Design a protein with these regions (language model features):
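Conserved phosphate-binding/catalytic loops in two-lobed NTP-binding clefts
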Residues: 97-106, 255-274
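Conserved phosphate-binding catalytic cores of ATP/NTP-utilizing and phosphoryl-transfer enzymes
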Residues: 3-18, 87-125, 133, 137-140, ...
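Adenine-nucleotide phosphate-binding core of ATP-dependent small-molecule kinases
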Residues: 195-230, 269
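Gly/Thr-rich phosphate-binding beta-strand-loop-beta motif of the actin/hexokinase/Hsp70
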Residues: 7-44, 120-138, 182-185
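Short glycine-rich, Thr/Ser-proximal phosphate-binding strand/loop in the N-terminal lobe
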Residues: 20-64, 142-151
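Glycine-rich phosphate-binding loops at beta-strand->alpha-helix junctions
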Residues: 82-85, 228-257, 268-272
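Glycine-rich phosphate-binding loop plus the immediately following alpha-helix
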Residues: 53, 139-179, 278
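Glycine-rich phosphate-binding/hydrolytic loop that grips phosphoryl groups
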Residues: 109-113, 156-160, 252, 265-284
Length: 284
């Protein structure tokens, strides 16, 4: 509901295509916290860290991004916050924050800016740690979307569970999956209980780690297709973003399920922070 209100009441702001001045974006997500510093429509500093304490995590990444940009906190002219901790951060950094906005519209803006697709149509897929989003945009403005993670477990979390069972870091899962064949192992990401059962069973059956990783990625791609993309009129190109877009095996699986290789822009995990920095410059 919040996203619908934003789309209606802030359409002019959402149509903004360029960042101006010196602005910061903070994305307080369930798994990671990201910060971006932008100046004159360019990213000049960025940082991320696993999410722990909302304020401490955001302060850390903001300082890291500022150091990378060669700037100080006082140099920031405006800041935008998004993600689960956006209101807490909006209060903590209230001397700088001009925008506190839900992640669906902010992420969409960051995605089309990073992919250089601000004009025309596109579909954005964001597979997150707590939920999945599929968003259609026209000229950078969302006009339809669907959100969800089935049962108590969302797709990004399922990939983390798989990685732990394979005793690897989630950043290694994609390369492992690219070497496997998902058809050799059955996997279910729709529910944490059944997902764990499938992991235990397939590994107990002696399936290779490569095949299990590939099956996990394919299962997630199928979930997004069946639960999210069936609810919207998919438009092309397809832009895949968020932290899970760095898992190459998942991107491969999404392409196989959809029959179209998705675009994964550089810095795709920073969509929320980029969107926050860009949109907050509209208040200068």
């Amino acid at each position: 509901m919040e996203a619908l209100v934003t789309i209606v009441t802030r359409k002019e702001l959402l149509a903004r295509e360029r960042q101006a001045g010196i602005t910061a974006g903070l994305d307080s997500g369930s798994s990671t916290t990201k910060a971006v510093i932008m100046q004159d429509n360019k990213i000049i500093g960025k940082a991320w860290t696993p999410s722990h304490n909302v304020v401490e995590s955001a302060t850390f990444v903001l300082n890291e991004a500022l150091a990378q940009a060669g700037l100080e906190y006082k140099d920031i002219e405006a800041m935008g916050t998004t993600g689960y901790g956006r209101f807490t951060l909006g209060e903590h950094f209230k001397d700088k924050v001009k925008l506190i906005q839900e992640e669906l519209t902010v992420n969409s803006k960051g995605a089309v800016w990073l992919a250089d697709r601000q004009r025309g149509e596109a579909t954005i897929i964001d597979i997150g740690g707590m939920d999945n989003k599929a968003i259609t945009v026209r000229d950078g403005i969302p006009d339809n979307f669907t959100m969800g993670g089935v049962c108590a477990d969302a797709s990004g979390r399922f990939l983390e569970m798989t990685s732990r069972r394979l005793k690897i870091d989630v950043t290694q899962l994609g390369a492992l999956a690219d070497k496997g064949n998902w058809r050799n192992a059955k996997m279910n990401s729709y529910c944490s209980v059944f997902g764990i059962q499938d992991l235990v069973t397939t590994l107990g059956d002696g399936k290779s780690f490569e095949d299990v990783a590939a099956a996990a990625c394919h299962s997630v791609a199928e979930q997004v297709y069946e639960q999210q993309l069936q609810e919207i009129d998919v438009r092309h190109p397809i832009i895949q973003v968020g932290g899970t877009s760095l898992i190459s095996g998942l991107v491969t699986a999404v392409g196989e399920v959809l029959g179209e290789k998705p675009i994964v822009p550089a810095d795709s995990q920073f969509i929320g922070a980029v969107g926050g920095a860009l949109l907050s410059s509209g208040f200068l």
